[in-house]
Amino acid sequence: MLNEAAGARRIDVLDEVTPTMAEDVLRLVAEAARTDGQQAVSEQGRLQLRGRREGVRHLLLTEEPSGKLVGYAQLEDTDPVEAPAAELVVHPAHRGQGHGRALGVTLLRESGKRLRVWAHGGHSSARHLAQVLGLTLFRELRQMRRPLGPPATLDIPEPVLPEGVTVRTFRPGEDEAAWLAANAAAFAHHPEQGSLTLRDLEDRMGEPWFDPEGFFLAERGGEIVGFHWTKVHAQERLGEVYVVGVRPEAQGGGLGRSLTAIGLRHLAGRGLPTAMLYVDADNFPAVAVYGRQGFTTYETDLMYRTET
């Protein structure tokens, strides 16, 4: 634990937060989202508030002497190659007072001045903070959306599976290890997704939105060769192409396209009017494929980093 007091604020750097602290952080994130229109801390970041996580540190900024939590940042140093990654948020009613910069400076120090920072939604205040901290833009993550309701439903192609491939839904308690292996193979080039652990999977399976009937597995010869995990955002009435993956040896035969169609048909069958997904802007083949499937860019998350 590291304490840093400066003027009317204090920043605590913790390896683990208590359940009460976690509730306070989630409340702060939700209040900021109502103003910003988007969560400043990702799903993974919110899940990492539960108990101690290797390589994860929490920065809690409180105003003194009240002790009110008005800022939060999370630093994850688990990538063996890339610099530590961070997300941060300041309560809307307490912005413009240097809290964001104070969190950013602390993140730089804690990361050894090797840092990547997400700016979800690419808000102007986040871009300004990145500039103040001397960070440069290096990654753009697009959120793309498409309609699902009639007549758009008719545009979802009929799935055509490669020879020998069958599709079924995920069986909790049976498929975890096999899916993790398939996920690691499919995303060997993508450490954020490919490094998911059993704990990460179980965290998501414990969420209210988890539905095995929307988690599709493609098998050939008893082995998982591809998958499409969908997610329903009930409050927003939004269906998500949460993750689509195909093992390298099964790529190139249209399996990913067919799995995407299966998931979209499932989401449309749930009566959801819109589907969304995330894709890196520089993944031109994927952006093109999703564009042909009716997706258009809705908003963009930006990642900044220190010069390397």
Swiss-Prot record:
The keyword Acyltransferase applies. It catalyses: 1D-myo-inositol 2-(L-cysteinylamino)-2-deoxy-alpha-D-glucopyranoside + acetyl-CoA = mycothiol + CoA + H(+). Disulfide bonds: none annotated. Acetyl-CoA 1 binds at residues 88-90. One of its GO terms (molecular function) is mycothiol synthase activity. It comes from the Bacteria. Catalyzes the transfer of acetyl from acetyl-CoA to desacetylmycothiol (Cys-GlcN-Ins) to form mycothiol. This is Mycothiol acetyltransferase. It comes from Streptomyces bingchenggensis (strain BCW-1). The gene is mshD.
